[in-house]
Amino acid sequence: ADYLQLARA
């Protein structure tokens, strides 16, 4: 999973 993307959700 892309945690950098999830953190901005």
Curated annotation (Swiss-Prot):
Record-level GO BP terms: neuropeptide signaling pathway
UniProt keyword list: Neuropeptide, Secreted
Localization per record: Secreted
Cellular component terms (Gene Ontology): extracellular region
Known role: FMRFamides and FMRFamide-like peptides are neuropeptides.
Family per record: Belongs to the FARP (FMRF amide related peptide) family.
Descriptive protein name: Extended FMRFamide-2
Organism expressing this protein natively: Mantophasma kudubergense (Gladiator)
